[in-house]
Amino acid sequence: MLKFTLHKKDGLARRGTLELNHGKIETPVFMPVGTYGSVKAMNPQNLHDIKAQIILGNTYHLWLRPGLEVVEQFGGLHGFIGWDKPILTDSGGFQVFSLSDMRKLTEEGCTFKSPINGDKLFLSPEISMKIQTVLNSDIAMQLDECTPGETTREQARKSLQMSLRWAERSKKAFEDLKNPNALFGIVQGAMYEDLREESLRGLEEFDFPGLAVGGLSVGEPKPEMYRMLHAVGPMLPERKPHYLMGVGTPEDLVYGVAHGIDMFDCVMPTRNARNGWLFTRFGDLKIKNAKHKPDKRPIDESCTCYACQNFSRAYLHHLHRAGEILGAQLNTIHNLHFYQVIMAEMRDAVEQGKFADWQAQFHENRARGVD
């Protein structure tokens, strides 16, 4: 089940509500990534505390470990991981296609070796839909071929045409399995605007309830990603939610919303947190730097997260230097809280018709830098 209601537009920026089987989501929204069924360094209560509305699980990794037979015993991923809000799962395609020297691609699907034990495995649109049905994610993704940014036009066209055929197979399998959740299609086409439009027009035939923009943030220069988003954003159908996969920095989120994107996911806030890289309203802070050793201030004095309300930069510096697990947890709480705050502020700005003003102030603040 999926119902998307568009409440307000301000330029291309949108404010909406997405109703799914496990709850309602206010958009635009950022989805923390829980690759193996857990958002690294966070438990479900932490996620509730930072007001995360939906998380992402990784089909490929959960298929390999713990395996479908385990998750199925819990009625799906929600019961297995103890999370009662919506979950989106990717198709597994990105991870499989990343195994370039370990996989063989055909029209039927992709054969590859398990990086865990070397077993020969096969992933097709039908198998991906079966896995995601067992996971019982609120939003499943079609299986597609993710092409790198430097793909030639000929390669990109051939790839997107196969992804369209896989979209048709994904939808048929999803419906045959009587999956009660929602399936999104994925717009491909590499860095070619006309191919992106061709992909989008091809997907219209299948009437997916939501569409994702894939194949960005896969190694191309940032200006190229922005150029493509600038071109694709206005093409996306107004009545459906728009999801930008695997992106990105705070600035990327703001650019995406400004170009009509409703949903985002990225490992950046969690991965950077574990490496001591913290995002703040006034730029980024590297907590491992020696200058923070005696600093009594919080990460960001304007932040209301648990880490900023209770701990100093000095303590967080110490935890990071000592390799303490608590350091990774507090850093992650802060970064994900900051991302959720950005999204909430953008929702409010669109509602008030002041998104451009908010955007200008956001960039001014971020350029100022952290004291």
UniProtKB/Swiss-Prot annotation:
Any one GO CC term of the record: cytosol
Protein keywords: Glycosyltransferase, Metal-binding, Queuosine biosynthesis, Transferase, tRNA processing, Zinc
Catalyzed reactions: 7-aminomethyl-7-carbaguanine + guanosine(34) in tRNA = 7-aminomethyl-7-carbaguanosine(34) in tRNA + guanine
UniProt-listed InterPro entries: ArchSynthase1/Queuine_TRR, TGT, TGT-like_sf, tRNA_ribo_trans-like
Metal-binding listed as a keyword: yes
Listed pathway(s): tRNA modification; tRNA-queuosine biosynthesis
Gene3D superfamilies the record matches: Queuine tRNA-ribosyltransferase-like
Annotated EC: 2.4.2.29
UniProt-listed GO biological process terms: queuosine biosynthetic process; tRNA wobble guanine modification; tRNA-guanine transglycosylation
Active-site feature positions: D90 (proton acceptor), D265 (nucleophile)
Chain positions recorded as Zn(2+) binding sites: C303, C305, C308, H334
Residues engaged in binding substrate: D90, S91, G92, G93, F94, D144, Q188, G215
Cofactor remark: Binds 1 zinc ion per subunit.
Enzyme class name: transferase
Name of a matching Pfam family: TGT
Cofactor: Zn(2+)
Region (RNA binding): 246-252, 270-274
GO molecular function, one term: tRNA-guanosine(34) queuine transglycosylase activity
Subunit relationships: Homodimer. Within each dimer, one monomer is responsible for RNA recognition and catalysis, while the other monomer binds to the replacement base PreQ1.
Functional description taken from the UniProt entry: Catalyzes the base-exchange of a guanine (G) residue with the queuine precursor 7-aminomethyl-7-deazaguanine (PreQ1) at position 34 (anticodon wobble position) in tRNAs with GU(N) anticodons (tRNA-Asp, -Asn, -His and -Tyr). Catalysis occurs through a double-displacement mechanism. The nucleophile active site attacks the C1' of nucleotide 34 to detach the guanine base from the RNA, forming a covalent enzyme-RNA intermediate. The proton acceptor active site deprotonates the incoming PreQ1, allowing a nucleophilic attack on the C1' of the ribose to form the product.
Classification via NCBIfam families: Q_tRNA_tgt, tgt_general
Family: Belongs to the queuine tRNA-ribosyltransferase family.
Name of the protein: Queuine tRNA-ribosyltransferase
Species of the source: Neisseria gonorrhoeae (strain ATCC 700825 / FA 1090)
